């Protein structure tokens, strides 16, 4: 496995080190190359993602990212210059976010709900494609537009990916989330595409939720969802709700995928760089380790992925039973690696 590693900023390098520890515990044949990308590089050189580095990244099987950013970088610089550029250059059209409440993890929701879903979010279109503009900026007559771009090609490939994932899961249930009563043009495209692809997956039950209703049900009845497919912006919002109801973004993993394998997919914890605790071994690497499980599964190493996922689940359960003890970042990583290897 040829793995590009972007530790990034703040706690990023610390949690990535433990993710690599766990990865090597189950898959020793890993050839890693580290890249200095993020806020530090921007402060020193003004660069976000040089073309030469982009071409080097292209030659890897996958990318493991820690976290990027610090308060001194203007908003949008790293998001568009690094993260979104990687997404568009490598055609990461599927953003995959598991939403699972592990045994022993407390949810802010009452009643210990059963939560186990995945959100398949379109990653390269919608309002984040960068279309739009500003007229008469700074005047009382300023006009700002952000356009949502949705193509049949882009929608269909994400819908098919979601159906394939639903077809492999026990419940075989797919929910399309959109707002087709107001966003009638894009909503119609999404709804028609789901309806036209559905006959190819006769065992998958399909339903629809408006995004406002889905947001409510994520909180009041999350067990009704199995696989959710949605557009870029709605998925961005729903997945953060999903993280909040399953222990917080500190446990949330994600994958930015090109399912075809033509380009390297990127895996990362959802949390930020947390510069206030950087270098103090206080960060929890669990989300990074869960992202490693997704990386392994994506590259076809299902058995190793299952071992890492089981290690995460057992560690979280034991952690809840142990109470207030707070191991260091390294200690958590060593424990997870031992569980995965054993």
Curated annotation (Swiss-Prot):
Reactions performed catalytically: (2R,3S)-3-isopropylmalate + NAD(+) = 4-methyl-2-oxopentanoate + CO2 + NADH
GO molecular function per UniProt: 3-isopropylmalate dehydrogenase activity; magnesium ion binding; NAD binding
InterPro entries, A to Z: ICDH/IPMDH (IPR050501), IsoCit/isopropylmalate_DH_CS (IPR019818), IsoPropMal-DH-like_dom (IPR024084), LeuB_actb (IPR023698)
Residues reported in the UniProt entry to bind substrate: 87, 97, 121, 212
Similarity comment text for this entry: Belongs to the isocitrate and isopropylmalate dehydrogenases family. LeuB type 2 subfamily.
Keyword rRNA-binding: no
Name of the protein in its database record: 3-isopropylmalate dehydrogenase
Region of interest (Disordered), ranges: 319-342
The protein's assembly and partners: Homodimer.
């Amino acid at each position: 496995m040829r793995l590009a590693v972007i530790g990034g900023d703040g706690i990023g390098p610390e949690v990535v080190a433990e993710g690599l520890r766990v990865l090597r515990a189950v898959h020793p044949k890993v050839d890693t190359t580290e890249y200095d990308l993020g806020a530090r590089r921007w402060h020193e050189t003004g660069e976000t993602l040089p073309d030469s580095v982009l071409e080097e990244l292209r030659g890897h099987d996958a990318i493991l990212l820690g976290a990027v950013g610090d308060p001194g970088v203007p908003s949008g610089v790293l998001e568009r210059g690094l993260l979104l550029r990687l997404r568009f250059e490598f055609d990461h059209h599927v953003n995959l976010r598991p939403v699972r409440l592990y045994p022993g993890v407390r949810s802010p929701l009452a009643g210990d709900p059963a939560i186990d879903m995945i959100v398949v979010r379109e990653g390269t279109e919608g309002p984040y494609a960068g279309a739009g503009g500003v007229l008469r900026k700074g005047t009382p007559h300023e006009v700002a537009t952000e356009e949502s771009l949705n193509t049949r090609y882009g929608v269909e490939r994400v819908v098919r990916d979601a159906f394939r994932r639903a077809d492999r899961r026990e419940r075989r249930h797919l929910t399309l989330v959109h707002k087709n009563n107001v966003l009638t043009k894009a909503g119609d495209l999404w709804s028609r595409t789901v309806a036209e692809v559905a006959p190819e997956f006769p065992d998958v039950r399909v339903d629809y939720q408006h995004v406002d209703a889905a947001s409510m049900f994520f909180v009041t009845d999350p067990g009704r969802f199995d696989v959710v497919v949605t557009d870029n912006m709605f998925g961005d919002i729903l997945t953060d709700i999903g993280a909040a109801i399953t222990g917080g973004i500190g446990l949330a993993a994600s994958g930015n995928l090109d399912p075809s394998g033509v380009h390297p997919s990127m895996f990362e914890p959802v949390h930020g760089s947390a510069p206030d605790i950087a270098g103090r071994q206080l960060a929890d690497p669990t989300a990074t380790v869960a992202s490693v499980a997704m990386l392994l599964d994506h590259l076809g190493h299902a058995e190793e992925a299952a071992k890492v996922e089981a290690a995460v689940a057992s560690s979280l359960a034991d952690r809840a039973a142990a109470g207030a003890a707070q191991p260091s970042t390294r200690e958590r990583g060593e424990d997870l690696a031992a569980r995965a290897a054993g």
